[in-house]
Amino acid sequence: MKEDPRHIRISEFNYPLPDERIAKFPLPVRDQSKLLLYRHGEVSEDVFTSLPDYLPADSLMIFNNTKVIQARLHFHKETGALIEVFCLEPIRPNDYALNFQQTEHAAWLCMIGNLKKWKEGVLKREMVVKGKPLTLTAERGACHGTSHWVDFRWNNPEITFADILEVFGELPIPPYLNRETQESETYQTVYSKIKGSVAAPTAGLHFTPRVLDALRKKGVELEELTLHVGAGTFKPVKSEEIEGHEMHTEYISVSRNTLEKLIAHEGKAVAVGTTSVRTLESLYHIGVTLLNSPDATEEELHVKQWQPYELTPEMASVSPVDALQAIVAYLNRHNMETLHTSTQIIIAPGYEYKIVKAIVTNFHQPQSTLLLLVSAFLRGDWRKIYDYALAHDFRFLSYGDSSLLIP
């Protein structure tokens, strides 16, 4: 790595984002969103259905097939009755990123277990988050079909809703439901399969069966991996320099088949979303670890936050193919079909991309680690595309428009 980004000031990645530019709702037809095109320094636009026109026929497009599941919150009434509250969709604010960053108050559409025991009143739970005592309350609002509006409030302005979910939320679906919950398809990608995320990988929300069919007809190969999106994805950067920001750990799974496709399509990987980017780039560093320590344990394969910036010149010279082949060899030795590990990687200016050659992604919040990732990919040219998007009525954040970035 050429540079160490630890002393980058997050204020350098700020831009004005008026509230009216944040998409409050998805479009009725997903693939009719606008598509900003950044190709070799030039910016233009089209509609998302035209995406296949801008990709070479021999590209390998990688999707994150994680499926959003409800965060489960437990409360006990004074009578002792257990109430389970499942967060289904953010309501106020209705953008995932903004909702997770709320302090003191957030509203969600929730499914409620043991509803008959919660006819009225405010649920309360005392808890400790980041070493700080906190009282979380939940108040039931209007009914929407089988779900209810729930207002969450807490009494510590230093704690975000993401912090609460990470400590207080549980992911598994309770067995007593004995059925699929009524999910809002708005929050799932059409190719979602593996349950485990508390938020959707939103870049994938633009894809429809007809866009996927058009990509296949073009000759683009489609492959999948899994990174479960945690609430920590939306953790705001509060330190002046990014050295003071601790990245969240996320769990990843990549099959032997996907690894072999990446090897066969060297230099042609198109990542759908920043979660796919982080997973693919983490694979390189996992491979480098295995080349140096072939008997590394699953825990030792975890990619630490600053690991990419601490490589020796010899380690940094490992080719992407050699790194990927080292993972395949590891799977062979252990008679495994899928790599399961975790990553805490931070991708920021100074990072040298090893595997990803193009990215499909939405427009991200000011002063976010996702914006750092985009800046690193475009070698600092992010302002050009964000200025264009703001000037040409693009919609921002989770429900916003898309972009195809090819440096």
Walk through the language-model features, giving the residues of each.
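Surface-exposed, charge/polar-rich loops and edge strands
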Residues: 1-407
